[in-house]
Regions:
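Outer-membrane beta-barrel channels and translocator barrels
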Residues: 10, 21-22, 56-58, 149-151
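Residues on the lipid-exposed face of transmembrane beta-strands in outer-membrane beta-barrel proteins
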Residues: 15-19, 49-55, 142-148
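An active-site-proximal structural segment forming one wall of the substrate-binding cleft
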Residues: 154
Length: 188
């Protein structure tokens, strides 16, 4: 199995800048995360940007707000369940060497398998190289707030918050022969 899997790797980078005075505050941060999974071609990358600021305009009025933006992109997340790579690996008899299955296709159409092309179990290299997926999510959320002080003991405050996201999911499966399939979903 060690020849089938890769060594996973993750790295994270963050930087932030802030300033605080007696009448205002400001903070900006940026983060980046890059991950490579244990399956070949498996990746997950994320970028985050946060801005937060507030100010006391005078003794009666103050405002503050925050916005966070993020983008997450994943490629070839592992499939789970019956047709995922792990289930296919578990179905391999002990007398079959994984090296013998690396050439998973004879002519680009039919996949090579120890059980024959019509069985429910697929060559794990076929699953790895012919079933692909990717997803990308953009997200923005935050708030804007205002506070009005009428007296030392009476004030009015209001906040507006939002959360918006858009996700795009793509999946392809080569199938056997001309029976391939592909789908694209946009979710907002």
């Amino acid at each position: 199995l060690k020849d089938y899997f890769d060594t996973g790797f993750a790295q994270n980078h963050n930087v932030s800048v802030s300033n605080v005075t007696d009448k205002s505050h400001f903070r900006a941060s940026f983060g980046s995360s890059n991950n490579k999974g244990v399956f070949p071609n498996e990746k997950l990358n994320r970028i985050n940007l946060d801005l937060n600021a507030g100010m006391e305009m005078n003794k009666y009025l103050s405002m503050d707000g925050k916005i966070s933006l993020s983008r997450t992109k994943a490629e070839d997340r592992p499939y789970f369940g019956t047709y995922g790579a792990i289930a296919q690996l578990m179905g391999i008899p002990n007398n079959i060497r994984l090296d013998d299955l690396k050439q998973y296709s004879t002519d680009g159409n039919a996949h090579v398998n120890w059980t024959g092309p019509t069985a429910g179990i697929r060559n794990p290299y076929y699953v790895l190289n012919q079933r692909h997926n990717s997803d990308e999510r953009w997200r923005a959320f935050g708030y804007y707030g205002m506070k009005i002080n009428f007296t030392d003991w009476l004030h009015l405050s209001a906040k507006y918050a939002f959360d918006y996201y858009r996700t795009r999911i793509e999946e392809t499966n080569a199938g056997d022969g001309i029976n391939g399939e592909s789908s694209i979903k946009d979710i907002t």
